[in-house]
Design a protein with these regions (language model features):
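Structural signal for interior beta-strand "rungs" in well-ordered beta-sheet cores
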Residues: 1-77
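Long, leucine- and charge-enriched amphipathic alpha-helices
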Residues: 82-86
Length: 86
């Protein structure tokens, strides 16, 4: 059985997808249409905007604006991640 952990006071928007082994710390706000890849973690008191994609295994430690794709640890914009991790 695959589990996810959603802590206290977390708000999750409509049509969001959360894969297995994800942890979301307390009082975070997840927008609408968000996709969170497996084995990712989101620190507490963060705002994840609408239409955000978080790649698997990512560690989110700061707010993510709307319409952004991030990955890595710490999570950063996918273009920056791909440029620095060739």
């Amino acid at each position: 059985m695959v589990k996810i952990h959603i802590a206290h006071n977390v708000k999750i928007g409509k049509n969001s997808i959360i894969a297995g082994q994800v942890g979301i710390a307390g009082s975070s706000v997840i927008g609408n249409n968000v996709k969170i890849g497996g084995q990712s973690g989101i620190s507490g008191h963060l705002k994840i905007g609408n239409n955000v994609e978080i790649g698997g295994g990512s560690g989110v430690i700061k707010d993510i604006p709307d319409d952004t794709k991030v990955m890595g640890y710490p999570a950063k914009n996918i273009r920056e991640f791909l440029r620095t991790n060739k």
